[in-house]
């Protein structure tokens, strides 16, 4: 519990302690995973587990925690099968996050963008471009750039060393061509990538 509370905004600690005291579940904090910020699952024995990525961004961590607590609440109150991010989850998420939606916990414009997001919350905050960019300001500083900031035709690299060229926008995604294979892939516009160092 102490580690978890150290990762959220100080103004949210009392609210979170109250929420967790009413919840019979285990919470595990793990190293960063590329595919998700957190997850909830029911174990075979019927107990519940939330796993959260450790992050230096207290606002991202808190949002993820509340997102997963909403899954827990739905699992506790609905014994029949419901959609993972259906209306039951959306309602539970709104109810849980409402006491946190103030500028003492989330500074503006983050608070306003989060309130807007909660009108119809997505399965992941990563699907909300404006919210993602606002949250990114509180991430640890990095030399990486956001893909949408690159010019069409510009070269970039993923963490695994694969090289791509940014091509064009397709609806909400960016089409990019892998240099080695020539295959086309769709990327999130806010994907963090590396670019070659500038030559003097």
Model-derived regions: residue spans:
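Metalloprotease/metallohydrolase-associated module, dominated by Zn2+-dependent proteases
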Residues: 2-6, 10-43, 49, 55, ...
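Active-site recognition of the HExxH zinc-binding catalytic motif
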Residues: 63-76
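Conserved short loop/helix modules at catalytic or binding sites
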Residues: 58-61
């Amino acid at each position: 519990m102490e580690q978890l509370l150290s990762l959220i905004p100080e103004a949210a600690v009392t609210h979170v302690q109250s929420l967790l005291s009413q919840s019979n579940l285990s919470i595990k904090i793990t190293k960063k995973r590329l595919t998700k910020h957190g997850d909830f699952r029911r174990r075979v024995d019927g107990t519940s587990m939330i796993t959260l990525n450790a992050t230096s961004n207290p606002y991202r961590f808190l949002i993820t925690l509340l997102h997963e607590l909403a899954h827990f609440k739905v699992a506790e109150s609905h014994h029949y099968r419901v959609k993972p991010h259906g209306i039951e989850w959306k309602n539970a998420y709104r109810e849980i996050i409402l006491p946190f939606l103030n500028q003492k916990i989330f500074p503006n414009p983050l608070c306003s963008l989060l309130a807007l997001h909660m009108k119809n919350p997505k399965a992941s905050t990563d699907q909300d471009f404006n919210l993602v960019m606002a949250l990114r300001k509180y991430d640890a500083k990095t030399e990486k750039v956001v893909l949408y900031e690159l010019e069409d035709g510009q070269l970039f690299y993923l963490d695994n060393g694969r090289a791509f060229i940014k091509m064009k926008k397709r609806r909400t995604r960016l089409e990019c061509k892998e240099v080695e294979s020539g295959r086309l892939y769709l990327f999130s516009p806010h994907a963090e990538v590396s670019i070659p160092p500038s030559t003097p």
